[in-house]
Amino acid sequence: MLRDTQIFTLIEKEYQRQNEGLELIASENFVSQQIMEAAGSILTNKYAEGLPGRRYYGGCEIVDEIETLAIERAKSLFHASWANVQPHSGSQANAAVMFAVLEPGDKILGFNLAHGGHLTHGSPVNFSGQLYESHFYGVQPETGLIDWEEVGTIAEQVNPKLIICGASAYSRDWDYKRLRAIADQVGALLLADISHPAGLISRGLLNDPVPYCHFITTTTHKTLRGPRGGMILMGADFENPFGKKTTKGKLKSMSTLLDASVFPGIQGGPLEHIIAAKAIAFQEAMSDDYFNYILQVQKNTRQLAQSFVKRGYNIVSGGTDNHLILIDLRNKGITGKLAEEALIKASITLNKNMVPFDDQSPLITSGIRIGTPAVTTRGMQETDMEQIAAWIDDVLKNHENESKIDSIRKEIGNYMLQFPLP
């Protein structure tokens, strides 16, 4: 069989792009060689519909062992009692939970996408906003912070069946204990989508949702530094509150409903090569090396925020607790779109992002989102964050000066030589 030189040439170009540039997209990271090896292994050949020990195909004895390892490691890492590691993505993990606990038209209460939430938390362009009656809470215009009392007030007014917490562009920690009290007060179930801060949560650097939330979903990439995929966790299993029973008349456990919602509900065969890579990522995340890494992510992000504040930039919420910052560029007279386009010319990759109460469209935006997981994986520390802020500031001040931007691009390329990819 002929080698597909066209595709492999493009892969090599992408390698060069990643190797020579500054990767500051908050949802991206660089996985280890052993994770890539597992993801590209012969496990991609195997079909394994069902769960370990209960498959619809033969020859699953070995993948059963692999998936069981992934499940047990996920439970150990997050101190959970139950896990399903089959979701292909965070969005599918969220869909599986919603399909398990909601009926079309049920009310959900999520964090406003325009304030830093996620599409799958009720956005009208997403299944979550099309199948369910979506309501939202957001941040305060004065502080950029979530007002938990207001969340409680909205919940009482809306009376949702499911409350969703979690974000894609919120730089602060979450009060899961307070949210559980709100959920209990209105009789709602509580879902925490920790896709972004999962790595920090797993090692105790942020509040833990597992003791308080009925369901926890996450991606396995981002701060967890694993392969692209999703996962569902529960701190404790419980009988479903909907009266759904087994053929013997016993109430089904919530884990049974969730498993069935993943398969056959929304997926067919699981990706066992990716599940193997997830298992490796979970083991890596329990190591001392990973703890030092994720602690450095938090330190780097705080330093980066300070470096931008020093240069007159407006950090939404005034700072950061996690792995990202959201910068409101309106006082700099440049849109998020223009900033993103100028920075990519300098080999600095990040994304334009809506800021709370934005007066620009989602395709233009007034802000940029910056994350440190990928550059921290490459070995960068606080002093490097100061340099990154200086480069970004320089590009934005000279966004129409092509020669200046090209000079910065070359400087960055040379600088990155000391920080090899894993």
From Swiss-Prot:
The protein's Enzyme Commission number: 2.1.2.1
Pathways per UniProt: One-carbon metabolism; tetrahydrofolate interconversion; Amino-acid biosynthesis; glycine biosynthesis; glycine from L-serine: step 1/1
Compartments, record wording: Cytoplasm
Positions of the record's site feature: Plays an important role in substrate specificity: 221
Obligatory cofactor(s): pyridoxal 5'-phosphate
Alphabetized UniProt keyword annotations: Amino-acid biosynthesis, Cytoplasm, One-carbon metabolism, Pyridoxal phosphate, Transferase
A GO BP entry: tetrahydrofolate interconversion
Residue numbers binding (6S)-5,6,7,8-tetrahydrofolate: 113, 117-119
PROSITE patterns in the record: SHMT
Recorded superkingdom: Bacteria
Reaction catalysis annotation: (6R)-5,10-methylene-5,6,7,8-tetrahydrofolate + glycine + H2O = (6S)-5,6,7,8-tetrahydrofolate + L-serine
Single annotated GO MF: pyridoxal phosphate binding
Job description of the protein: Catalyzes the reversible interconversion of serine and glycine with tetrahydrofolate (THF) serving as the one-carbon carrier. This reaction serves as the major source of one-carbon groups required for the biosynthesis of purines, thymidylate, methionine, and other important biomolecules. Also exhibits THF-independent aldolase activity toward beta-hydroxyamino acids, producing glycine and aldehydes, via a retro-aldol mechanism.
Subunit text: Homodimer.
Name of the protein: Serine hydroxymethyltransferase
